[in-house]
A protein has these predicted regions:
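Conserved P-loop NTPase "ATPase switch" module shared by AAA+ and STAND
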Residues: 1-13
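Catalytic cores of nucleic-acid endonucleases
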Residues: 246-251, 266-304
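Interdomain motor-coupling "hinge/lid" segment immediately C-terminal to the ATP-binding subdomain
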Residues: 34, 40-147
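Loop/turn-to-beta-strand initiation segments
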Residues: 1, 24-30, 260
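Accessory nucleic acid-recognition modules appended to NTPase machines
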Residues: 110-250
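A short acidic, amphipathic alpha-helical/loop segment
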Residues: 15-19, 273-276
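Structural recognition of the conserved hydrophobic beta-strand(s) that form the central parallel beta-sheet
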Residues: 3-4, 28-34, 54
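Conserved catalytic cores of phosphodiester-cleaving nucleases, focusing on short active-site segments
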Residues: 236, 240, 253-269
């Protein structure tokens, strides 16, 4: 078995792996790359011989299992929507999810929490590596432009989840609007941000919302005032992002999954003013239980 980490640092790596595959048929090769890579599209010599696996951060379910010693299984979105009340009844006798939910939101997505070292410092180092190595090296961007990408990421982070003003961002980092859009796409490919579009639209059009890829990143960037609603929407989008397409609906706090399922993320403690609609699924935070089309937000962390 040949194990290779960050294979993209080796020049002509894909053709060399192909030679190894052809010359040593009994050799098993395992290599790591980057989410910025377009593995099959940009490396045709590997077509048909490589199986790729996308390694994501921990889901809330995985974090909960690690912290409590339980072995809760994942559920599909359909199972959660149609059977959430029964699912919750199998979980609550064993654990109180809300006791662990804030810890997950703060530091549970990345495995650094398992190490007895400074979590924020490790995360900042990883964020730097994503920009300095993954984006610059793989996209072949000159080092002199690194500060522009980092500044753009910071500006997007402190603005919070909203539609980016591309013209203002271009002025801030002194580059063209087209380059800003490319940088935004690179940051999304590096899993530092999520870009949200209306149904039927995608890059290179301007997104209706840019948000951090996961809630842990929001705590790592300073100074930033973290809003609970923004944290919970970031968690929701990140939880669905693995296997579902998430689009922006026509109102704040509303999202559309897979082009048909309408969601609203809301606080269970502040719902007196909400008119509940049978056509909307309410993902409610600050509660452990749900009913009918009102589902506790934490349960969407059981999607993988």
């Amino acid at each position: 078995v040949l194990l290779i980490d960050q294979v993209f640092k080796q020049p002509n790596w894909s053709s060399e792996l192909r030679k190894c595959h052809d010359l040593f048929p009994n050799l098993k090769i395992i290599f790591t790359g980057s989410s910025v890579m377009r593995l099959k599209e940009e490396n045709p010599e590997l077509n048909g011989i490589v199986k790729s696996y996308n390694l994501r951060g921990f889901s809330f379910r995985e974090f909960l299992n690690l912290q409590t010693g339980n072995d809760f299984r994942p559920y599909s979105l359909g199972e959660i929507l149609n059977n959430h009340e029964h699912i919750i009844k199998t979980i609550l006798p064993k654990v109180s999810p809300l006791k662990y939910f804030h810890d997950y939101i703060h530091h549970g997505f990345y495995p650094f929490f398992l190490e007895h070292r400074n979590f924020s410092e490790n995360l900042l180092k990883t964020m730097n590596m994503m920009t300095e190595v993954d984006i610059l090296l793989i996209k072949q961007i000159e080092l002199k432009y690194l500060h522009k990408i980092k500044k753009l990421f910071y500006l997007l982070a402190v603005e919070g989840p909203k539609a980016p003003n591309i013209s203002n961002l271009a002025d801030e980092i002194q580059t063209s609007r087209a380059t800003v859009m490319n940088y935004i796409k690179y940051l999304a490919d590096a899993r530092l941000i999520n870009i949200i579009y209306p149904v039927g639209e995608e890059f290179p059009k301007k997104p209706t919302k840019v948000m951090m890829h996961n809630s842990n990143l929001m705590y790592a960037i300073y100074p930033i005032t973290i809003d609970d609603q923004e944290l919970m929407e970031t968690f929701f989008v990140n939880s669905l992002w693995k296997d579902h397409i998430v689009n922006q609906a026509n109102k704040d706090h509303f999202y559309i999954a897979d082009g048909e399922k309408h969601f609203r993320i809301c606080d269970a403690h502040g719902e007196q003013k909400i008119r509940f609609s049978p056509d909307t699924i309410y993902a409610r935070y600050n509660t452990e239980v749900g009913k009918e089309n009102q589902i506790p937000l934490w349960l969407f962390g059981f999607l993988y």
